[in-house]
């Protein structure tokens, strides 16, 4: 898990180099800043969010695959961020797997690697099915032969 934190991906220490090195080898889940790092590593751009979302909830629709398997859609997610993925500069290597009802990118999945990112916080009490999402990610890691 590449965890959340303050600032931009460029300020995230070794997070981006870890994603570059290990995405082909092991499952990775990026949360908030970790999600933004995944997007930048694969050629996308992070920009200012349409509005600040610190301690707020949103409804989010998802594709019901991998980490979203067996989760309600739409679901409520807890958000704590002021930056988000740019749709205009989104990398071809990634697929958008979830968006808010107003169209903001909330989750991405790599097209080849077991690498996923979520802009929201699954660990937040405000995220309705965060525990199951994390369990789904752990299932991915348990199935993977390293």
Q: Where do the model's predicted regions map?
A:
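Cysteine-nucleophile active-site neighborhood
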Residues: 2-70, 76, 134
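Glycine-rich nucleotide phosphate-binding loop and flanking beta-alpha elements
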Residues: 7-8, 86, 126
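Phosphate-binding/catalytic loops
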Residues: 112, 117-128
């Amino acid at each position: 898990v590449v965890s959340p934190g303050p600032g931009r991906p460029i300020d995230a220490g070794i997070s981006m180099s870890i994603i570059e090195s290990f995405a082909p080898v092991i499952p990775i889940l990026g949360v908030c800043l970790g999600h933004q790092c995944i997007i930048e590593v694969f050629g996308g751009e992070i920009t200012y969010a349409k509005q600040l979302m610190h301690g707020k909830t949103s409804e989010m629709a998802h594709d019901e695959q991998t980490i979203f398997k067996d989760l309600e859609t739409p679901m409520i997610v807890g958000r704590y961020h002021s930056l988000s993925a740019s749709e205009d500069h989104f990398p071809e290597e990634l697929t958008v797997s979830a968006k808010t009802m107003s169209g903001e990118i909330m989750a991405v999945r790599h097209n080849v690697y077991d690498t996923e990112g979520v802009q929201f916080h699954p660990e937040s009490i405000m995220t309705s099915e965060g525990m199951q999402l994390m369990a789904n990610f752990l299932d991915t890691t348990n199935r993977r032969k390293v």
